[in-house]
Amino acid sequence: MRMLMVGAALVMMTSAAMTFGAMADDDDDAKGAQKLAMQGRDDYWHCLAREYSRDSNQGMSEQDFGRSVAGACPSERQYYRVALLDYLTAQYPNIDAGAHLATANRAVESAQKDIVTAFVKHRPPAK
């Protein structure tokens, strides 16, 4: 009987350790996904900043600059979108993937809108 209780205790401790290990792995995965999403965001923003500061943008209208920004940095934009999607999926696995994709797309659109807003606010006045 005593061996049975020791065996049961070992099974329970092993199960608890495995569950904790899985939770720690999930936490590590989420932290890694968050780090990649933040890196993707930073890379995309830096690329947009390079686009913003090009001399060829001088004299562009807001609409033309907006179109230029929308097509700029395709690899950085896609990496940011995918990394953010991965992070959201890891962080909120019970939410529909379509909702995560919509959120990632809104984040990309927001970055583009912010760059266009900065362009409009800081361009020299028309002569």
Regions found by a protein language model. Name each.
Residues M1-L4:
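Positively charged n-region of N-terminal signal peptides that target proteins for export
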Residues G7-A17:
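Bacterial N-terminal signal peptides
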Residues T19-D26:
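Boundary at the C-terminal end of the N-terminal hydrophobic targeting segment
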Residues G32-A83:
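Short N-proximal segments of mature Sec-exported proteins
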